[in-house]
C-alpha cells in the first residue's frame, strides 16, 4: 500500500470517528466537509499547544526575573539594570529611506517575556512619626492607582511609574488629610516647616526594605513592589 493510500485510509477512519462525536457530527455531510472539519480540529489543536507552550515559557521567564529582583539589593546599581540600559529588551523604530515608512522592530520574544510587569495599583499603610514614636494606633490607608500620564515621559515607559511619583503622591495625600492639619495646628506650624518630600516621606517595599531617595528615578517594578501589594510608609514630623 502506497503512502497516499495509507493517508487516505487513516483520514477516512478519523472522519468516521468524528461523525460519531456529539455536536461535531452535524458539520460532516460528505468527504469534503469531513476533511475541512478534520483540518480545523488539527490546526486548532496545534494552535492550542503552541499557546500553552508560549504561556509556560513566559511564566518561567517572568518568574526568573522576579526571583532575581527579589534576591537583589536595593541601591543605586538598579539604575544600571540590564533591562533599563540594554536596547536588546526594547523595540526600535527607524525610517525606511526608500519608502519613507516608519518601521517598528520588536525585541526578541524571550527578552519581551523576561521584563517585569509595571505596577498599576497598590495599597499603602501610613503612620505618622513624631519624635521617633508612632502617632496612630490605626495607620492611614491609601489606595494608589497609576495612569499612563504618570510615566509617559520616562525613557522606558513600559516599566511604569518611578518611586519619585509615588513619594510625591503620598506627600500630597497626607497634606490633604485632616490629621495633618490637626498635628500642624497643635505644633504651631513647626511640623509643617520640617515636613518635606525628601525628609518626611519614608517608603518601604513589600519586604519592609527602606527605599532611599537616591533610587527615586527607578521604576517601582524593580524595587520588589508588584501590582496589588500592600506596602508601608512613614510620615516624619
Curated annotation (Swiss-Prot):
It comes from Saccharomyces cerevisiae (strain ATCC 204508 / S288c). Present with 2950 molecules/cell in log phase SD medium. Part of the third module of ergosterol biosynthesis pathway that includes the late steps of the pathway. ERG29 regulates the activity of the iron-containing C4-methylsterol oxidase ERG25. The third module or late pathway involves the ergosterol synthesis itself through consecutive reactions that mainly occur in the endoplasmic reticulum (ER) membrane. Firstly, the squalene synthase ERG9 catalyzes the condensation of 2 farnesyl pyrophosphate moieties to form squalene, which is the precursor of all steroids. The keyword Lipid metabolism applies. Keywords: Endoplasmic reticulum, Lipid biosynthesis, Lipid metabolism, Membrane, Steroid biosynthesis, Steroid metabolism, Sterol biosynthesis, Sterol metabolism, Transmembrane, Transmembrane helix. One of its GO terms (biological process) is intracellular iron ion homeostasis. The chain crosses the membrane at residues 36-56. Disulfide bonds: none annotated. It is found in: Endoplasmic reticulum membrane. This is Ergosterol biosynthesis protein 29. Disruption phenotype: Causes lethality under aerobic growth conditions. Affects the methyl sterol oxidase reaction performed by the C4-methylsterol monooxygenase ERG25 and leads to an increase in intermediate sterols and a corresponding decrease in zymosterol and ergosterol production. Impairs Fe-S cluster synthesis via increased degradation of YFH1. Leads to increased mitochondrial oxidants. Leads to an increased accumulation of iron from the culture media. It is a single-pass membrane protein. Coiled coil: none annotated. GO terms for cellular component: cytoplasm; endoplasmic reticulum; endoplasmic reticulum membrane; nuclear envelope.
